[in-house]
Amino acid sequence: METGGRARTGTPQPAAPGVWRARPAGGGGGGASSWLLDGNSWLLCYGFLYLALYAQVSQSKPCERTGSCFSGRCVNSTCLCDPGWVGDQCQHCQGRFKLTEPSGYLTDGPINYKYKTKCTWLIEGYPNAVLRLRFNHFATECSWDHMYVYDGDSIYAPLIAVLSGLIVPEIRGNETVPEVVTTSGYALLHFFSDAAYNLTGFNIFYSINSCPNNCSGHGKCTTSVSVPSQVYCECDKYWKGEACDIPYCKANCGSPDHGYCDLTGEKLCVCNDSWQGPDCSLNVPSTESYWILPNVKPFSPSVGRASHKAVLHGKFMWVIGGYTFNYSSFQMVLNYNLESSIWNVGTPSRGPLQRYGHSLALYQENIFMYGGRIETNDGNVTDELWVFNIHSQSWSTKTPTVLGHGQQYAVEGHSAHIMELDSRDVVMIIIFGYSAIYGYTSSIQEYHISSNTWLVPETKGAIVQGGYGHTSVYDEITKSIYVHGGYKALPGNKYGLVDDLYKYEVNTKTWTILKESGFARYLHSAVLINGAMLIFGGNTHNDTSLSNGAKCFSADFLAYDIACDEWKILPKPNLHRDVNRFGHSAVVINGSMYIFGGFSSVLLNDILVYKPPNCKAFRDEELCKNAGPGIKCVWNKNHCESWESGNTNNILRAKCPPKTAASDDRCYRYADCASCTANTNGCQWCDDKKCISANSNCSMSVKNYTKCHVRNEQICNKLTSCKSCSLNLNCQWDQRQQECQALPAHLCGEGWSHIGDACLRVNSSRENYDNAKLYCYNLSGNLASLTTSKEVEFVLDEIQKYTQQKVSPWVGLRKINISYWGWEDMSPFTNTTLQWLPGEPNDSGFCAYLERAAVAGLKANPCTSMANGLVCEKPVVSPNQNARPCKKPCSLRTSCSNCTSNGMECMWCSSTKRCVDSNAYIISFPYGQCLEWQTATCSPQNCSGLRTCGQCLEQPGCGWCNDPSNTGRGHCIEGSSRGPMKLIGMHHSEMVLDTNLCPKEKNYEWSFIQCPACQCNGHSTCINNNVCEQCKNLTTGKQCQDCMPGYYGDPTNGGQCTACTCSGHANICHLHTGKCFCTTKGIKGDQCQLCDSENRYVGNPLRGTCYYSLLIDYQFTFSLLQEDDRHHTAINFIANPEQSNKNLDISINASNNFNLNITWSVGSTAGTISGEETSIVSKNNIKEYRDSFSYEKFNFRSNPNITFYVYVSNFSWPIKIQIAFSQHNTIMDLVQFFVTFFSCFLSLLLVAAVVWKIKQTCWASRRREQLLRERQQMASRPFASVDVALEVGAEQTEFLRGPLEGAPKPIAIEPCAGNRAAVLTVFLCLPRGSSGAPPPGQSGLAIASALIDISQQKASDSKDKTSGVRNRKHLSTRQGTCV
């Protein structure tokens, strides 16, 4: 997209608000050649100018320093904008402008245009002058922000262009920019933008009586001799057309060998028989393709249309219906002679209303037209089926019979084909479309011509998503319909364009997903030529919140190879002008594609012809097989033939490039098994419910859709409206998420299967018919009525699971009379889903069972006979959510308030007075039919409902009639710049001027561009033309537009103000509704007539006031901080003493100053009748107050109904108030105090003693247990006695018997586990003094232990050393540790 601003070339000078004037340097009636730049210069100029202007405007500095008031003047550092301009730098248009100069510019401003803006320009020339508009730059949000161009001075004049999106030079630097022409001498341009996103806007040059496009630089602008005020182009040689923009006889047509140039006739090349092309440069046949624009006769603008349909019959292209700006001269039926290039108008006597978005299909001499939107009938989508007979030129209508439980959908934006099935039945197949009731339909509809019946068949294969504005072609070879693109509702409540390609096999009713094109679009065309589907044009805009440059109108040219499942991009038409469009039609004759009409800001009436290469031109086998793109050829017996004409004998098929399996990322987009496996991308369905590449590893995969189990979740997700969701009993509509969800499987119960709209159960028990029926009845069901193919397939699959026994179950089919069989649900047996076996039904049987033979079928049997099995059926138990009725569809809501009552679900178009689904706004108004839409607030639907001139001129179809008082009073009327208008027919185009509605002779003044200077709403005269002198009639405001405080009403346009009725509890009320702003907290109601009893407020505001009832001994806090409390200046309280022998204390404080009054009363009517209360306290401007009321003084005992009233007033918002009433003794009772104190102290002491005693007991118990464990452990240790000989000097102890021999021995050895180490324990004699005795206080002996290695000792030694150790117990078993 182009991001630059609008360039003003030359030396522009401001001419009027909203226009910039530039005088051309050359003559010729204001031509523009002197300042035209090439495309690259435009882009560069736009970029620099945009950056410079944006750098100024975006800075929030005083305008005196920056000088950045774009359309205004700087006064006191503030921009004062010229009329029609707004913004802090006056940079956005917002209003109406009148341009009277012979040429000039108009623009929306220097930067991106404003959100939610409406701007209108009236260019006024003189009657019947030719006015030309050239769009040097145009960039708006496609399909949402539009510029409307009318050939006249109001929106009731003929509409000639609706511009939207990006319109800039695209292919060549010298490419001509679009030009729009009006012939009335006036042009009204109205621009509307919504609140989504904005772009750089537009720069439009206009000129009056100038040559078209300045003769495109290929001619001279000349003044007409007969009419001096008119000019025309004298074209240079080899250029023709009104603007000299059509080249002819290039290279002199290759004369004389190839052809010659016809200079006297139509000025084109006349080729010799062996040459073709616009310049006779291609052979016949040719290996190259080319485009041409034939000379059409007559070339009437009324032929132009979009969203029409065309079919080919012989040499005639029949065009029926379509959208046009003006239906008054619209021809419903046209035919175009493809040989002579002549249009003819069909003149049937009677027929259908004009429509667009319908379908056409040809069968023999009849053209079948179905559905579409009837623009002249409130925009309703119809389900009418009309037949046009070509021979008799007459219409007839058909009313088909809908079979079964099907539905006939009224749709638009669908497609249709008629073919003969293998069953010899001729069927018209209607594909997808949008229904105003059921949303985007994904169903196939069949119309059987011979039986005049309608059917919605069940399809197999992939689960596809239907939409609006797709294209489809039927291929006789594959017996399939190929469907591409469209505008669809997508998951997650999203919607947009798609590039999907589906194949529908008409005989097997199977869907397959093919390779997508990579270029999303809708309202394009598609034809089938030589095995290739050619896609041309369409709307490719798919932006949401940010533009990425996608164009509304495309000239993209794509080719799909059916045999190889490959897409190719073909070159765009290389013609002398743009051919971008959408909403066109295309047919094929003699291998050439003819494109007609469409929309590209204007309604197109031209014919484009595409001549593809001819297979016969290829002489080589390899060249033949590799021909393309856009053509498919086969080699047959040494010559090349087209894909369709070749027979099956001796044919060498074309080569296809090898296909590789898709990546996992590509396969992840398929969320169900059927779509994953019924496509050509090479995917497989893995056991963990995920679609992955066929080359990826998977433990258990499904590669054929016939093995898939259809999940209701995937079917329900494709249903885009509550109505369509409710038709499928397996689905339910979630109102909060606004999506269709599958019903849970447990709705049937354990042992049952949820199939379609029923629960089925197969049992193998052997019963007769009556007992089988009783069995099902006990399960709250009945014998099954198998009326759908899904139910039959399920039962057959269940029967096959019984491998150990033969199951032939009873079904709910019995003989009603001698020739009639019926199901148990009273539906007739149609012999379609199930059939009788050969020889059946026999005369002896009155009940039927299902026999599983080589071919499954029914057999008749006596009802008393036994059968092996039965099939039960019961209805689905629907949850509460599904029981909720759907809301009224948007298309059935007839008022703005009803349409916008449910948030963003619906959108109201005020100009067409239609309500549409939010996800279908684009397709409901594909050609900008809606001038303005609303989703919340509703404006008056007619001009008469607008009360002020400012409101009136905001609507492009209204004008203001100012009354003679010149005080701002008047009335708003539909009108034009010349005066008011009135409606004489049903459509707004049937408006005529009626100046009597605002008679000038009676001093009424008509205002269309700007309001009269004095706008005092009839309540004051003006001084200095625009200043209200003194507002009267209880009004105030700069324009006396508001009521004075204390009054309400709508004083605009002479309205009255009424005093507020607030029961004395408010001084002001809402200015318009009169709802009182009550000043006392707790009083509510429109007239302050109620107390807020739900929040403890009591009283009667009609006779007094309201009080908050306080509880004694509680503190209450009132935070008046919310916006709803802004008007509160008072709050009242009441309190009743609870004890008659205690004083009543009051405490009140607040965050702001307040006035306080306290009264008391014993009467029951106090608070409502003055004089009943006695004043106690009256304080002003305080923040805190405390007091005590004596029970003796006020005699609480004798006055049990005594009530204290507290009035807090005159405070400011916001405020926080705390108040409390309490009753307690004033003199402390010492006896009671000490009794209470000692009671508490002794209780606490007792508790402490008990806790201490419990603690001591627990401690003693734990100590005893610990000692016991220690004694047990000590008692379990090993022990022994040992003799010790002590020597003191040389003496021997007396009691030793015998001498000591050998070395000293240990007193103990404790071997470790493994007997490789031990702990040795010995006695040691400590050093002694000279006396041989140890020092005083010390022992002479000590015990020492050491770890020793005993692995090298002899066994005998070890035995000796350990012989003294006895009673050894609990030796450790852990290696390397001692005991």
Swiss-Prot record:
* One matching Pfam family: EGF_Teneurin
Q: Which GO terms describe its molecular function?
A: carbohydrate binding; Notch binding
Q: Which residues face the membrane's Cytoplasmic side? A: 1252-1379
Q: Outline which residue ranges sit on the Extracellular face.
A: 53-1230
Query: Where is the EGF-like domain positioned along the sequence?
Result: 53-91, 207-245
Segments forming domain Laminin EGF-like: 1014-1059, 1060-1108
Region: Disordered; residue ranges are 1-23, 1354-1379
Note the subunit structure.
Answer: Interacts with MC4R.
Provide the protein name. Attractin-like protein 1
Source species of the chain = Homo sapiens (Human)
Where is the organism placed in the taxonomic lineage, from the top? Eukaryota, Metazoa, Chordata, Craniata, Vertebrata
What is the primary gene name for this protein?
Answer: ATRNL1
